Amino acid sequence: IAGCHHQSVKQVVALAMHAQSIGYDFIIILTPYVAARDDETVFQFYEYICSKIDIGVILFNVPQNCHPINANLAKRLSKLDNICGYKQADGSPASTHAIIDSVGDDIVVSVADEAPWLTSMTQLGLQWLVNYNPHLYQSKGWLPLKDYTDAALNGDLTEATRIAKSIQPLRELHAKWIMGYWNSGRMPIAEMKYWQELIGMHGGETRPPVIPMTEEKKRELKSDLIKTGLFEIV
């Protein structure tokens, strides 16, 4: 899935065509956060893009930053041939249930949060998890998300629940280091990158205007990860 987010429909189309040309199967598009402030504008944004491309499109609902893709708008958009998925970043259960009731039989819906994934699979019937950092919960040879997903799909809910509970310390660190900053209005890219490096994945340097972590904060994050006992810290 290629992220093709842009304020300009022409740029989205260009990005989508490039993604398709290099082998991507789907793209995901965030609703514009500048000009699109009502349902009709959002609909026309996606309608125009879909008329110009031939690749599957996933809607991305982030009501904290953009005009919400509510159940009625999602129903309209689901009729466009390209629209095949919906990524839900609204934390409201009522909103998620409304989306599932509206379009759950037409397109695939994902709640963009790992914490309720086991419940989403087993109770809501959701088929996929689209999230930006489940990789922070795994390392080489240890894939707990895959393991508890496989266990649930194989009908072993006891084992799935056991594995899912085992990574609760990481969820708590995620709430502190990632969502804590995110919910306060700052993108926690530096923290994501350093977390990756500590568990053996190259994160690289941040680019302006993202501010790097201080050495003090790095030591604190490293100490927090060590205390979980779940990783061999690099």
Place the predicted regions along the sequence by residue.
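Long, low-complexity C-terminal extensions of enzymes
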Residues: 208-234
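Conserved short secondary-structure transition element at the edge of the structured enzyme core
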Residues: 168-208
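Glycine-centered loop/turn motif at secondary-structure junctions
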Residues: 23, 81, 124-125, 200, ...
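Electropositive phosphate-/nucleotide-binding environments in soluble metabolic enzymes
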Residues: 9, 13, 138-142, 154-161, ...
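Catalytic alpha/beta core domains of metabolic enzymes, predominantly
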Residues: 48-51, 63-176
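Active-site beta->alpha loop and helix N-cap motifs at the rims of alpha/beta catalytic domains
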Residues: 1-66, 211, 231
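Helix-coil boundary/capping segments in enzymes
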Residues: 1-16, 27, 106-113, 173-174, ...
